[in-house]
Amino acid sequence: MEIKQIAVAGSLESSDMMITISPNDGQGIVLELDSSVEKQFGNHIRALIKTTLARLGVESATIEAVDKGALDCTIQARTIAAVHRAAGVEHYNWKEIDSWNA
């Protein structure tokens, strides 16, 4: 999926995450994480975001993630929403997304 514009999903409330995604002109994935639980879960959060991006077919993007203790399901949901908004996609392929949980 091609990232065409800047998009944001989520909030800075407790137990949530704000993801900002923008085009990166073919330079791969650049991920910046600011997390209140960085020392404990930083590597896991980065891996989860990158896995979600890969499943969506995103090969190049700049991602700024501000985590306030979000659960995995919230991190995935915010990443999916931000990618679809940034790519200009209006309809989600729920069957594909649901298959990730198998």
Curated annotation (Swiss-Prot):
HAMAP family per UniProt: CitD (MF_00805)
Name of this protein: Citrate lyase acyl carrier protein
Cellular compartments annotated: Cytoplasm
Function: Covalent carrier of the coenzyme of citrate lyase.
GO cellular component, one term: cytoplasm
Keyword annotations: Cytoplasm, Phosphoprotein
Modified residues (O-(phosphoribosyl dephospho-coenzyme A)serine): S14
Family the entry assigns: Belongs to the CitD family.
Lineage start: Bacteria, Bacillati, Bacillota, Bacilli, Lactobacillales
Description of how the protein assembles with itself and partners: Oligomer with a subunit composition of (alpha,beta,gamma)6.
UniProt organism field: Streptococcus equi subsp. equi (strain 4047)
Main subcellular location of this protein, as a coarse class: cytoplasm
